[in-house]
Design a protein with these regions (language model features):
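Class I (Rossmann-like) S-adenosyl-L-methionine-dependent methyltransferase catalytic domain
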Residues: 1-59, 98-163
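Short secondary-structure boundary/capping elements
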Residues: 8, 79-80
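Structured loop/turn residues at beta-strand edges in well-structured enzyme cores
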Residues: 20, 62, 91
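A structural signal for the main folded, soluble domain(s) of proteins
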Residues: 69, 82-85, 117-118
């Protein structure tokens, strides 16, 4: 991901919303035009909004189809941001998307990679560069084709003996 995307961040977020079509959405940060358009087109979607920081108890106890962090990490100390993002990824959502200005939040791409997020797109507007990182549990680790009884030392004994 060396070059900049031809799309705008709003277009990329709109495409993400269309692709995943979440029924329950968690937004950390401020609402944005692409989200408003999605909400109008899909009035049945439940959207929970929280400000940057620790999740309120009622949201922390819920699962969401998609979590979006937009204009969020720039307003948190890095340690708090890591805890928030890791907690959401582990406990609250199977899919996560983060739009961040790395120079404003003090993060590096490797910080996102360490949390198993992938660099999806990079956007530039004047001097500002925004990065979109995504995580999808369903695409994170595919089961290798060799991980089955056919390739075990004694596949005929699979399920027969316990030692």
């Amino acid at each position: 991901m060396d070059g900049f995307s031809q799309r705008t961040p709003q277009q990329a977020l709109a495409a993400l919303l269309d692709r995943y079509a979440p029924q329950r959405l968690l937004l950390i940060g401020e609402r944005f035009p692409a989200l408003e358009a999605f909400a109008q087109a899909h009035p049945h979607v439940q959207i929970a909004v929280a400000s940057p920081g620790p999740l309120p108890g009622e949201l922390a106890a819920q699962r969401f189809d998609l979590a979006l962090l937009v204009d969020c990490l720039e307003h948190l100390p890095k340690r708090d941001g890591l805890q928030l993002l890791g907690g959401i990824r582990n406990l609250n959502a199977s899919r996560v998307a983060v739009l961040a200005d790395l120079s404003a939040c003090g993060w590096q791409e490797t910080d996102f990679f360490a949390l198993a997020l992938q660099a999806s797109e990079k956007f530039q507007r004047d001097a500002q560069v925004l990065n979109l990182f995504t995580y999808d549990l369903h695409e994170y680790k595919q089961v290798p084709d060799w991980l089955n009884a056919k390739f075990w030392a004694n596949p005929e004994n699979f399920g027969k003996y316990w030692w």
